[in-house]
Amino acid sequence: MYEKILIRYGELTLKGKNRDSFIAQLARNIKLITGEYPETKYDRMFLTYSDANLEKLQYVFGITSYSPVIFCENNLEKITNSAIKLVNKDDKTFKISARRNNKKFELTSAEINQKVGASVLKHYPLIKVDVHNPECNINIEVRSDKTYLFSKTYEALGGLPVGISGSTLHLMSGGIDSPVAAFKLMKRGLKVSFLSFISPPQTDEKTIGKIKDLVSVLSKYQGKSHLYLANYSKLMNYISFTSNESYRINLMRRSFYRIASKFAKGKNIMTLSNGENLGQVASQTIESLSTIASASDLLILRPLIANDKVETINIAKQIKTYDISIEKAKETCELFAPKNPVTKPNLATALRLEEELTQLKDLEEELLANEIEHYTIE
């Protein structure tokens, strides 16, 4: 019965001169995820109808909603026959919502509502009109060349098309927060690449598999993803010799940021991102965040900075990362955590401790040159 899927985009129409580039990016993303370029018409997009496409469109950012549609000629009889097809025999109430964009059509929107509604009542004698809360709302749009009709609307993700806002290198862990942060960054139009620090043999194949599984789930929302695994074992062992054990996590995370910044620049990525949340752990106090962030000269995006944990968990369940995130696995930060981590670190102290670790920068350069593996995940 259905011929096409009508795709609506919201924020994109508000972007003025950039509108064409937004629409083009959205079309490319739809092609990437469904395998088919949509047709753009009437400030809408149209994609071939299939159950597979209906399912895949729920993963495309930039779409506000979509509906399976029937096309017909601008002829009242054809419109009426198409409308009758959209009524389910079990529907008890209905409404006709007509919109006449083609002012040359002989009937007004109100007249279309009346005449098509009368025909539906005649065809289904037991059905009743309910203009407030109908079980079946038949939408009719009369355009210049044809009319399209639909009764079902699927809510979509909204946001902006992935890639329109640039790209970010996301410091990825296997916890609950990090994948949710990546999802939110994609929703604001960023293409996300992933960098994860591992420390074999302490972090085993199960840990690596968990991270790959999380990136695989997230790839449904942006298409092909790049995952980089950095072997941090030598550096972790070296930093453990710091003269102030309470600064161990701060020194490690500062090292993460130095490495990530250089690596990102090499990939022409100008922002870093993570799943940090204010005050959640010792390394996420204002003082810790400030001390750690000063190791990078790139913008650091923290989309979860003010989230409640419950909010983050709810999103994780929605996007199907939660069950993977709660699987038991050894994380580099957990393995390295001191008994009493400093909660209000001082930058001057961190810099002094780094100076004592005379081989630190050389080991970071060695990691960048030899210890990063690349995976493409779809």
From Swiss-Prot:
Its EC number is 2.8.1.4. It is found in: Cytoplasm. CDD domains: PPase_ThiI (cd01712), THUMP_ThiI (cd11716). Signal peptide: none annotated. It comes from the Bacteria. It catalyses: [ThiI sulfur-carrier protein]-S-sulfanyl-L-cysteine + a uridine in tRNA + 2 reduced [2Fe-2S]-[ferredoxin] + ATP + H(+) = [ThiI sulfur-carrier protein]-L-cysteine + a 4-thiouridine in tRNA + 2 oxidized [2Fe-2S]-[ferredoxin] + AMP + diphosphate; [ThiS sulfur-carrier protein]-C-terminal Gly-Gly-AMP + S-sulfanyl-L-cysteinyl-[cysteine desulfurase] + AH2 = [ThiS sulfur-carrier protein]-C-terminal-Gly-aminoethanethioate + L-cysteinyl-[cysteine desulfurase] + A + AMP + 2 H(+). ATP binds at L171, M172, S196, F197, R253, G275, Q284. Residues 51-153 form the THUMP domain. One of its GO terms (cellular component) is cytosol. Its main location: cytoplasm. Keywords: ATP-binding, Cytoplasm, Nucleotide-binding, RNA-binding, Thiamine biosynthesis, Transferase, tRNA-binding. One of its GO terms (molecular function) is ATP binding. It holds the Pfam family THUMP. HAMAP family: ThiI (MF_00021). Catalyzes the ATP-dependent transfer of a sulfur to tRNA to produce 4-thiouridine in position 8 of tRNAs, which functions as a near-UV photosensor. Also catalyzes the transfer of sulfur to the sulfur carrier protein ThiS, forming ThiS-thiocarboxylate. This is a step in the synthesis of thiazole, in the thiamine biosynthesis pathway. The sulfur is donated as persulfide by IscS. Belongs to the ThiI family. This is Probable tRNA sulfurtransferase. It comes from Mycoplasmopsis agalactiae (strain NCTC 10123 / CIP 59.7 / PG2) (Mycoplasma agalactiae). The gene is thiI.
